[in-house]
Amino acid sequence: QAQENRPLKTLYLLHGLYGCHTDWLTLTNIRRYATEKHIAVIMPAAENAFYIDGKLPGQQYGAFVGDELIRLTRRLFHLSTERKDTVIAGLSMGGAGAIRAACLYPQNFGAAAGISSAFLTREQLSPEHPVFTPEWAKGIFGSIENMESEYKNAVLKMKKFMQGKAYPQISLECGTSDGFIGINRDFHRFLQEQGIEHYYEESPGGHEWPLWDRGIKKIINRFF
């Protein structure tokens, strides 16, 4: 009874490109994992905006998932307001978005996790690619240069903002057959160079739901 009355620890869980807020519910066992740990899971929709603050009104998806959503859901539900009880995670586009959110709003999150995170560089862009074209990148990030520096700059901003205070814990995982393995290895090395302690794992598999299901279970067990 005492556990039931306590404010719930919370996982904010972000979907990937061309996904939606129901993906995690329908394609993984997140409901069971959350029930076993007695945590709340908040799954917002962000279209294909890469959880970046756009130029037009109503497109501030970065501020939404990093700050506004946290304040809103805490007013609506019986959630813990403790930073240590608040985690953000996601896959692919959502993985990169989760890491970015925790770095830009570190006061809100005790931990952040990305699975198969899409820390895009110009090597992923091609005029023939069905999604990642140079024009697409400019439309989302403003420029290709902004896209390439977005996530590393977020880490640097976190270091400056926290000024010696404890950073959010960071967890990264990617499949060894995933096309994003190279950019995840690069981001892992960057975190090492910056002295950011983090968990990094490479697992058998590709850009696929079985890996993401296993990954989110590990994330929940690690942080809750």
Specify the residue positions occupied by each region the protein language model found.
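Non-catalytic cap/lid and distal C-terminal segments of serine-dependent acyl enzymes
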Residues: 1-224
